Amino acid sequence: MKAPLELDGLSGYFGGQRVLGPLSLSVAPGDKIALVGKSGAGKSTLIRLIHDRVGDEAALVPQELGLVNALPVFHNVFMARLEQHNALYNLATLIRPFKADREAVTAILGELDMSDKLWSPAARLSGGQRQRAAIGRALYRNADMLLADEPVSALDGPLAHK
């Protein structure tokens, strides 16, 4: 994020009723913010509202990870940049990934202790490995902001702190 993020009037509605807000939020570049609260307090709703407002400036790790079970971890991570390439490039990457893409994804997965799972189908991953694959996808997006909704809930202590 190059400039401070200023959001005013964030409100969430469910069934026509306001369930959150209106809220104002100011975030400076480099800030790390954690939302803490009881179940049902609106944390996930607030994250979705922020993501809807900032769009492509943010990478999102949702609670529902959105992994494609039939595809290997590489392709699930690579999906973060699909819109940066044309359809032919993406199709070629599905068949035989380019070296630069393989190296970039492998580097991120290495940071997440997942290098050995590069070509494993997402369906064969444990819950914690699935979360790390989704985190890898968000990091590969290389957006100015990272929004994560319970991103380490299935990770053990040492991995969660990493």
Question: Would you name each region that the model predicts?
Answer:
Residues 121-125, 129:
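Conserved ABC ATPase signature
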Residues 5-7, 19-22:
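Conserved structural motif at the start of ABC-family nucleotide-binding domains
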Residues 157-159:
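Helix N-cap at the start of a conserved alpha-helix in ABC-type nucleotide-binding domains
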